[in-house]
Amino acid sequence: MASDSVHPKLRAATTLKGGDRLAFVVPKDVLDEVVEGLGGCEETVLSETVCGGILDPNEVEAWVDRATRLLRFRVDPEDLRSELPIVADGLFRLLQQVTLAGSTTAEALVVRFLRRLIELRQMLSLDVEAAFSGDPAAKGYDEIVVAYPSIRALAVHRIAHELYDYGVPLLPRVMSEYAHDRTGIDIHPGAQIGQRFFIDHGTGIVVGETAVIGNRVRIYQGVTIGATSIKNGAALRGKKRHPTIEDDVTIYAGATILGGDTVIGAGSVIGGNVWLTHSVPPGSRVMAEAPRLLVKGSEGRALVDESMDVDWNI
C-alpha cells in the first residue's frame, strides 16, 4: 500500500463542505507566513509600484472592448446616443487614475477624443478596404470586420495612439498589450501608421514605439519593425529607435527591419526572412540569399537540385 505523502497538518486542514465539494483550509501558520512575506510596500519594486496606485487592467480591458465595438459596429443613431455617454464616462474614470501633464483635464481630453471618433472610424474603414483588396481569401467586408484579428488590433491601436498623442500615460500601453494578448499582434501605441494599412495573418508582428509607417503598407506574419539593442537602453528613451516605412511597401513573413535611421523607400518589396539594419532606396527589391532546394527519392538519388527562384512580380 502506498504511503500517504500528505503532510499531517495539511491533511487535517482538509474538510468537506457543501456536500461532496472538497474545500481546503490554509493552516494559520502558513497563512501568516505568506501574508508577512507578501504584505507591505517596501520590499520590492513590484510592491512599491502597486502601493503607489496603478490602473486596474480589468477596467481598461472592459473599456477597450466597449470603445472598439463602438468604432467597428455601432451605426444606429439611437444606439450611438446611448452608447457614447457610457464610453465617455468610462474613459473619464480611467483618466482620473493616471497623472495628466500640466493643466490638462480629463474632461477636456474626453471631449477631444469623442470628436476624433469620426476620423478614427474613417481610418479603420480604409484599413478594412485594404484588407479586402489585399486578401483573396476574404469573401466580404463583413468577414474582415468580424473575424480578422488585424482589424481588431488596428481598432485598438487607432484609439490607443490617439490617447498617446494626448500625452496620456500608461493607459495606451495597457490597451496595446491587451490587443497583443488577444491577437498576437504587438503594436506600440506610439507607432505612427498611415492609411490603408494591411496586416495579413498577423501572428508575431512587432511594431516599435517610434516606427513610422506610410500609406498602403502591407505586412505579413512574423515581421519585426524594431530597434537595435544596446547595453544602456535607457539612454535611447525619447529618441527615434525604429525604422521608417514609406508608402506602398510590402514586407513578407519573417522579415526583421531594425534601427531608427533605417528608411525603407516607397514602393519597395522586402522578402521573407530578410534581416535589414540599413536604408534602401525607393523601388528596391530585397531578398535573403536564395535557398537551395534538394529533393531525393527513396534510393537517395537527387530528383531536384536547384536554387529557388523568386518571382518579384508581386
What are these regions (language model features)?
Residues 183, 188-189, 194-195, 200-209, ...:
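Left-handed beta-helix
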Residues 139-141, 158, 180-182, 200, ...:
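Residue-level signal for pocket-adjacent positions within structured domains
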Residues 175-187, 230-235:
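Short gly/ser/thr-rich secondary-structure transition/capping motifs
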Residues 221-234, 238, 273, 294, ...:
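Catalytic core segments in nucleotide and nucleic-acid processing enzymes
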Residues 167-170, 240-244:
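Short, positively charged
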Residues 2-177, 301-314:
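Terminal amphipathic alpha-helical/low-complexity segments used for targeting or macromolecular assembly
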Residues 61, 236-240, 258:
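Short, well-ordered coil↔helix boundary/capping segments
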